[in-house]
Each structure stands twice: as C-alpha cells, then as structure tokens.
C-alpha cells in the first residue's frame, strides 16, 4: 500500500509553494461534472429499468406511449428500454471515422382488444404481442465529457435560455412618444403557445397568443367562463349608493376618500361641514368623519354621473334588465332606475392614482357576448379563414393551454409561476388553469396601478441552463413524436393483419433527429483541442445563442452585460471579444446546476458571527435573501468575524454590515472566476479587459515539445490538468510492474482488487495523435518500475502538462527595455538560444486522405504502377503504392499512388494489336495520386488503410492489422503474466508446509511440501500435486479453474478484436478503399509567430537575435526575451511585472538548491533551506512527511526553479515577494548578478558593444506562450491560380490559393500618385480581363513585355444585370 500522505505521487516530487492566506474550505469540484451528470441522467444506463426516474430517455418514451389507434381497439404500450454495448470503443471510432454510440432497444407491447366483448367502460384483451424494437442509436459521452461523431470529437455546449414561467416587464417608455410605461406580462411554457398580455397607450389591456393579432383581454376572460359581472367583481371593489329623490347616500369608506379633492361640501351626520368644496381630503378629515360615527355621506346627483354599474340591475317586477354590468350612469338612466323603484346601487370604485378603470374600459370595447362567442373570436384569430364549427372551436381552445400533449409548463415553469403569483407550493399541473390566467391579469393590473415590481430578465434566477441531456432528450422526443404519428395510422391494420411491433415502428425519424442535432446543431461544436485548458473551457461553456435562444443581431447591451447574479456563477472575465461578447460565458470555478437547471454557488454558513464548515449551495433567487461576506474577511483563531463592520453583499449591492448580521460567507476568493481566469496569477492587479485577453489567449497556446511548469502559478494547474483528462491517472492503487513509452502496467493492491477480476491495470498511452486543431496529443510516462501508487495519482503526462500540472508555455528570462526599435508596438525580440534549444518547437500533425472510388468508367485503383513517374519518385512507396512510415517528404512528393480510368479513346487495329502483345495500359488511366501540399513538409508517422467489405485487402492493410493484433496480444500476455504470477504466489503460500498424498516427480504419500520441492517442479505441474487436506485440494482446484477461465476469456477477447479488425470498413457510398496518411510537421519559432503572456500582453516575434547580441547580466547570463516597457503602463496589466519578480525569486532559489546539490550538501542543510522557502511565509507545507530520499528527489526537481502559487484575489503581497527575493539572492549573489538593492532590477550590458546600460532594467522569469496563430499557416503567395466563375476575378484566401485584394482605398492611393498604367494593369489583366491575361502570357513567351488591356469581365456582368432588369444596353465602339 502506498504511504498515506497528504501529497500525491507527483506532488511529492515537486511541491508548489502557495501564498494563499487561507486554507481551502471546499475542494474545487470535478470540472466536467455538469456535462457528465446531465448525460448520465439522460441515459440512466446503469439504473435498473424498474428504478429509472422519469427524465431523459425514460421521460421521452413515457410522453409518446401508449399509442392508441383511432378506433381505440389497438394499443401500443412501452415497457422498458435498454442500451446495447457499443460495437467499437472510443479510439476505434476515431480511427474509423464512426460515431461512438449505443443502440437503444425498447420493449413494447402490442395489445389488441376484442371488439365484440369490449364495452366503452372495460375493454377485453384479445391478444398481447411483446417485442424488443430498435429505436435508433444514441451517441455516448466519453469519459472526458465529449462525443465522437463521425470520428471527430465534438462538444455539446450548454444553453442559457429564458426560464419557463411568467414574466412581467415594461417597455421602459420607448414605445410611446410621451415616455409612458406600458406594462406587459408573458407566460412562457417549456412547450406550447406563448400567452402575452399588454397595455396600450390608452390603457386598454390586450392579450395575444404566439405573437399573433392582439385582442381585448376580456375576450380571454369570457372564454374561460367569466361573465362581465364576475370580471368586474374580480378586479374592482364596489361603492354602495342608496338612491334618494335627489342625489344619493354613499356608504363611507375612509381610505377611498383620502387624497381626493372634494367636489361638494362633505358633512357629518349632524350636518357640520368637515371638508369644504374644492379642498383636498386629508387623513385628519377622514379621522373626524369616523369619530363622528358617519356611515353614509350625502352626495349630489352629478357625483353619480359617469360612474360604472358593477352588476346587472334587474326590474324586480318585470324581470327586465334596466342596466347592464359595466354601463355608465347617465341622467336618463338614473331617472329610469328611480322610476323602476331601484334603491340600492353598486358601482365600481376607481380613481386616477392606484385603482384605474382599465378592465372596465377594455370590457367596453369588447363586442363578444358570451363564452362561445369569445372562443369563436380566438379561433378566428388563430385560424383566419376557416369556418368555426362548434367542435373545432372548443377543441382548439382546449388544445391551446389545457392539453398536456401540446402544452407543458415543465416542473421549472410551474415552480417559477407559482412563486411569482404568490402560491406556496412549488408543484402543480403542467398545464394552465383558469385561476392561473386570472392571477396573471390581476398582477399585471396591480403593476399598472403602481403596486409591485417588474422582473429583471437578465437576473440568473430568470435564466436557466439547458444541458446536453435535456437538449438530447428534446431531439429524441421530436423523433418519437414523428414515429407516434406514423404508428397511429398503421395501428388500425394490426387488427386484420398479423403485424408485430417492429413492423409498425420505423426508427429512421429518431436517428435523423439525433444525427441532425449532434452533427449540425449550433450547440454541437467541433471541440477546441488546442491544449487541455481549451478542452475544459469548451465543455464548461454556457451560450445564450442557439435554437430557442438569442441571436447576435437582436441581443442588446443588457443581456451581454455583467449582472450582479453572475457572482460565483458565471465568470465576469472570460467571454469572447467581438460580436459574441457577453453571449457566450464560462461557468465559474465552484458553480453547479440545481435540479431545475439554475446555477448555484456554494457559501459557508455563518451563525452569530462564527463561520462554520457547513456549506450551502444557493441559487440566484435564494441568494437575494441573505447577507454574504467576502471570502477574505478576517477571522480570529476561533473562526469568528473580526472588526465592527464587515464588507458584504446584500441584494447584489456591496455594503458594510455589522458582523452579527452576516448569514453566509464566500468559500474562496477564486469563486467568481472561471478555470481559465483562475490560472492567471496576480489577476487582481490586471485591468479587466487585459485579463479577458489573457484568459482567452491561454486557450490558444500550442503544446510545445517539452512542456515546462509555470514558475508562478495559482494552484489550480493540477486540478485543471487532471480533470481535463489529458494526463493518465491511476484507477486503483498498486505497484508499477512495467513501463515503456507506450504502456504502463500496474499490479493492483490486494485490498483494491475486485474478486474474480484481473488484478492488473494496463494503461496504453496515446502517441502522436492528431487533435482537432492539428496539434499533437502525446503522453509520456512519469513513473518508474517499482513505484508505489495510490488511486488518482498522475502516472503519465499529456500534451501541455508537466508532472500533472497544466504547462502551456515556457519560463523565459525577460528584460523590459527597448532594443533598437525591434520591440516597437508590442513586437517581441527573442534570443537565438531559445530557438536552438527547441523551447518553443511544436509538432503539428496533418491528416491527408485519398479515396479510391468506383467511377462510371471503372474503379480507381491504389497502386505503385503510375504512368509517367520515374522510379526515383516512387522509391518511398511500398508495393501497394503507399508511402512508408518514417519517410521525410517535401511539397509535391507522392504519398499514395492512385490511378483513375480515362474515357476510352477509339483505337486503330494496329494499336489494339500492339497493346495485346505488350500489355501497354498506361494511356487509358490518369494519375490522381495524393501528394504533399505546397508549403507543407514533414515526416510520415502513421498510415491507415480502410477497405470496403468484399474487396481484396492489399499487403499494407494486412500488415497494419497484424501489427495492431500483435499490440493487443502483448497487453493480454502482460495481464496473463501478472495473473499467473499472482496465482502461483497464492499456491506457494497455500501448499508450503502441507502434507501431500502424492504428486509429480514421484512425490511420496505423507511428504511435507517445501519450497525446494516446489522450485524443482514446473509451475504448471503444481496443479498435479494432491494435498491430503480436502480444503486445500478444493482451493487448489478453484485457483486452477480461475486461471483457465481467465485464459479462455483472453482468447475470446483476442478473437473478438481479430474479428473487428478483419471485417470490412464502413466507407462512404461509392468508395472502395480509403488511405489516411499522417504527417508530423515540426514548427520552430520564427519571426511572424504570435506570442503572449498570461496577462493579455500579446505580440509578434520581430527578430531572432544571436545570443551574443542579447543584453546580458553581470555574471554573463543573457536575456531570452526583450519586451517593450511601454506595453505595461497604458494597458494596466501590472500582474505581469509582479509575475516577473516572483519568477525571478523562484529561479534564484532553484539555483541555490542546485549549488547545494553540486557541492553535495547534507540533507539536513537542504531540509533547512526548503523549510525556509516553504514555511516562512504563506501556506505551511508538511515537509516532515517526506523521507530523505524524497527530499533529495524533490531538490533535484527544484533546481530549475521553485514553483509558486499565487491564488487569484488571494495572492502574494509585495512584502512576500521582497522576502522571497532576499532569500533567493543573498548579498554576495546579488552583487555578482549586478542586482539593485530591491533585487527586482539588474544592470544589463549591451551584447554588441559590451557597455553597461546606464539604468537598471527589470528582469525576471515570465511564463510565456506561443499561440496557435503561426506565420507558416498564414503566409501565402500566388502567381496565377483559380478564378471565380462569374466575375473571372482571382479567388481570395489561402485555402483557395487566392490573390491579394486590391481594394477601393488602394485604388485611391494609385490615383493619388497618378500611376495610371499600374492602375490599368491592376484593374484589367491582373484581375478579370480574360483575353488580356492570355495575351500577356503570349507576349512574355515571345519576349515582349507589353500589356494590351481589354474589357474587364465585371463590366459584362454589370451589362447582364441591367439586361435582366429589362433594360437593353449595348456597347458601341466608336
């Protein structure tokens, strides 16, 4: 068992000294959790069918089934589904260009009911047919959270969309010129019709369905069963009047009078005037009226006029309706009412301030009379031009909001809806109810009346994340819905014909829907694989674009902006520059999704000012209820918040609060940023714009030949490397049994081995694999034979990782000084030594493909027999016509020989005879071989040959298969070797000292077995020993059986592999054979390459200077890179300067350790110095855990520099950096290097003259990256090449081998110079004058250098365009 220690295998080799002021409370969660969890929940592959929860595939099937035939006598029920084992593993899919997927098989029952004996209440089953039906293939997620689609690795990006529910907003006064706020509400379901309510400038309330024509809202209220009386009763309170002979008595309600201007004298019971006419009624007046016991107030007649009747007034004698609800009172109407003897009158109470008559006014313009008429009106709006029959009208209205098949609010929508309208329960039906609609209209009217607040749509409580699982489920549902339609139509036939479920179900729609989504959806993206950081960021990306999301053009400023709720959920720094800024975001480091898809972030609970270790995840909505302190708040020894006031956040605002009011505290200062931003040291000293560039450019760093750990990191490097899946980690603890460049074999610890399984883990390393960006993925072992490992230890480094830490660049000695103008405007000056040492050399792998197709004239052939090629040009091709692995090729070299049949030419009899005799075949085929492109060269590192089923394999293909089988057999042999060794060890322990009944080499009965005897017998003959004890004999037998079983299973595995390799390959239609050749290209650093630091300090290499000309230090050390100091102050990314200082300290310490090792200092002295480095400041490390050997091994690793971690927002202070510099450079050393007092600057000498520069220069080490914008990929020149078909102008761009555009402004420049002939040449023969350019060619051949410019083709295009408009235009030559 590996020793229990806080340090892993790689950490023991190199501990990163951290300056973090507080220990981590919560480990950084697994960074691909969101993707992995979402897809696991979608598939539920490892859950027993009976125990599956209703989500993902299960929910999709449940929504589509049961399917019932039109007559109701046949039904198809879904029982369960299961997923088959994928036919090919991930690596095989990548090589063969297949999709890594699993077949879905659903068990369905076809139930046929007996027509005769069935009644409408109970149906009698006639027969049931059960069958498993193939339901398409579902792509599987790899361990790294990506998908392999058609052989390429893709990522499904999560989408941030508006949560279902109800939203209230106003137009911010933009619609109407007066600036009046128009309020609106919108009910957004997960699936189904949107329902909008909106006020117009006249305060009439309208509704619209799916953004169609708007209609008065009372039509909808009538359609849901309300009549005008109940509508008014729902929205208004009533004023009660008692009609007198003249005037009336108003029932007195104090709060309704307050603030009104009295239109008449208001008196109390005694007739005393309390409020005079035209005075405003105040709270004092209403109090006097109450105290005087006033219950009614006399009001004059004109006070009643214009008031609105609240309910129908019916004549008690005749039953005639005298006044309808919502009718206005007029003098005539009052007269009529008095005449009919009506005494009590109820009118609605409205006022200008907070009780508007909006619904009443809307009801007035609504012409529908009853519920049916209202539904007809809605039908006409939804289906204009169709005759509204009663059935159709009712069916449509039901289908709009009340039918679960067509309308689904979803759990999230219902939860948000209920929360918004003030219900306590979070669950409920997934369709709307009448109460729901009424509640929304009530809230909207209240808003217009000035009560309540509108919603903020950019609040993360109103936006939720749709993950891979949910997106895939929606696609699967679409496919199933199409199947459902088809099955429903055919179910009727199942009664007459003996059909089985698979005859009815065609899985094509599902496959098509999934294929379309995974292959072509906007959210299914080609994985960014430049380096591990790019991969991990891509999988954690959250996009607001995509189907059902925003579009770039429509997204305004608010959506893109940083919102307070982004804190700890979405990174405020990492987002692309350009049109997508703010629409594509990255998940913050600790963020996760809750069950509803809202982003949550963790906080530590604070109780009475004491910070506990309890951690709660809060969503944006919950967070608003609490006061949350920052992670760097100072705590005393007991963990209490110190100081009177603590900096905290309340409802998104930063405030200072007393310690006892704080309820939560951040878990880490890095909580607010994403992975990429958290890898930038001293981020807190950089301007946000530059930090954004720094985080984005880290993702473009190319993996170099020998990755080097950053001297100054942040402590996240290890987590990011391990979670990205680039490094290889041990699945189980154990001892390394065998290591070479391609595989690591680990013998698993006994306590971790599962009974009945092989106790061996074999890790096959990836060698020179091409990434999506053509960079090189390559793994190197970092363990030795005999090393003890624990589970999770890093055992092999991948691209851009060094000892299990992300290492995207190299540590370079940087000097900040101008150098002869070569670092003007962000240019970078580099020493030749950097290039000579291959520090920035990267390997790029290109894939070249050739296909032999079946053409009309016959099959193409891959062959060495190519017409018109000399033997010299063919000498690197093998007999199959395919290049050897290891060949170095130049532009134009043949990689794969291929000939295509030409059209048959008619032959004379003589030619036919000659051809029959000599077999001359060359003339009827043309050479279409695969050649190396212009401008690329390299070494062939791999060749793959794919052959269609039924076509003879060539020798090369056979050899590739044999090699692959040999490799596979090696793995199996290793496993077998360890299993056998293990078994024989157990047998030895079992038999030693036991009594035998006999055995090989004439073992006498009753003899004790000893080790010497066992050693003399062949191990496989040990099984022939017959132990006397029954129990021992059975154990021996069981070991023998287990061994045989293992051998048998290995043979089966080998056979399966052989079958897989020898079966024909799936190739595109018409392709008989396909050859892929992989070229490795070495790219050295050269002028024109883009480089950058991690702080947004980017530049282009301007010159590579001989090392002897570079500025050097007093001890002769030359600088590696010279940067312009003017690039720092205006850009405000000071983090780079601090990084340089701290890197300088790390290097100095490394050199001191190196000196100690060189003079073979005692381990105690080393320990003392390491203690001083690690434990004098910042976080303490437990070096006592390491043995002397481990200390020595670590010291050797540290000679290149001591790595530091300066966590984001909790980094090293200026004091700490100064202390480290003092420790690294004692006075004597500082003097020898010519350092200043602070050790941050040095006096440099000019490499060319040897003179000392007069001022000291800032020098130190910075982690500098080479980016994926390489000059080799961009540089391009053309003499003649392809032309566009219509305009006859040269194409553009390197890919098309295009020309340089001579644009409008360039034409002006030539005009300004008066260079008429140059201009004519540019606009004619060098562009689109077809005759002219052939003429020029002829003239050059003749040796005349004359130009005859003709008519540019673009003029002819213009003439044709004008003619197409029906205008005849002719060119007359004068």
UniProtKB/Swiss-Prot annotation:
Protein name as annotated: DNA-directed RNA polymerase subunit beta
GO biological process: DNA-templated transcription
InterPro entries: DNA-dir_RNA_pol_bsu_ext_1_sf, DNA-dir_RNA_pol_bsu_external_1, DNA-dir_RNA_pol_su2, DNA-dir_RNAP_su2_dom, DNA-dir_RNAP_su2_hyb_sf, RNA_pol_bsu_bac, RNA_pol_bsu_CS, RNA_pol_bsu_protrusion
Enzyme Commission identifier(s): 2.7.7.6
Complex formation: The RNAP catalytic core consists of 2 alpha, 1 beta, 1 beta' and 1 omega subunit. When a sigma factor is associated with the core the holoenzyme is formed, which can initiate transcription.
A Pfam family matched in the record: RNA_pol_Rpb2_45
HAMAP family with a match to the protein in the record: RNApol_bact_RpoB (MF_01321)
Organism of provenance: Acidovorax ebreus (strain TPSY) (Diaphorobacter sp. (strain TPSY))
High-level lineage: Bacteria, Pseudomonadati, Pseudomonadota, Betaproteobacteria, Burkholderiales
